[in-house]
């Protein structure tokens, strides 16, 4: 795993993340970056296949760390800011397997599962960093057919291949609010990414 993608603040939070490793697994862009090493991480997304109580998480966390801000506390999601790092706890309704581990700290899905989750979420939140992740996955690791097949296994009838492909090539509503910091050797222009994603969408 490519732990160099973490910021100093994230490394300091790993013992806290480990406290919840029995119920939650690490997903999203941070988990993808740990597999690939392409960009700096900025947050932690922790998913559970079972429900949880946000207020109980709040109390447990405050015994070990100062919470700067509670951003979301509703059924199925608890998002906070600690040391400037956004940490999200989320109840995930789909059957994913946490087959990998970051040392003995936290479990994670394999890269193909993470790719399927990322592509499935693409149309729900158009952030440039998500397109960057998809680009590196399809460029160096899996074909679009691989990812679509995995998506069908996880999301069943909700998997829409035609929609996936169109979303990959549509950039009009993309948010660039969260800048992408590439790790050394992975630098690439936005235009090059857009060009390749359009090609992938047609492949």
Question: Language-model features: where?
Answer:
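Compositionally biased terminal segments of proteins
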Residues: 1-203
């Amino acid at each position: 795993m490519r732990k160099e993608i973490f910021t100093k603040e994230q490394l300091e939070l790993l013992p806290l993340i480990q406290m919840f490793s029995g119920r939650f697994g690490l997903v999203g862009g941070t988990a993808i970056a740990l597999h690939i090493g392409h960009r700096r991480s900025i947050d932690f997304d922790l998913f559970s296949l079972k429900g949880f109580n946000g207020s109980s998480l709040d109390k447990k966390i405050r015994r070990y760390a100062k919470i700067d801000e509670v951003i979301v506390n509703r059924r199925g999601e608890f998002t906070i800011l600690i040391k400037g790092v956004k940490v999200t706890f989320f109840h995930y309704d789909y059957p994913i397997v946490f087959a990998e581990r970051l040392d003995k700290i936290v479990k994670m899905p394999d890269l193909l599962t993470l790719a399927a989750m990322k592509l499935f979420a693409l149309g729900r939140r158009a952030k440039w960093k998500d397109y960057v992740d998809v680009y590196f996955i399809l460029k160096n690791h899996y074909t679009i057919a691989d990812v679509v097949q995995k998506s069908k296994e996880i999301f069943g009838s909700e998997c829409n291949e035609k929609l996936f492909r169109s979303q990959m090539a549509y950039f009009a509503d993309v948010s660039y609010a969260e800048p992408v910091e590439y790790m050394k050797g992975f630098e690439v222009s936005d235009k090059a990414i857009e060009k390749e994603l359009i090609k992938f969408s047609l492949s």
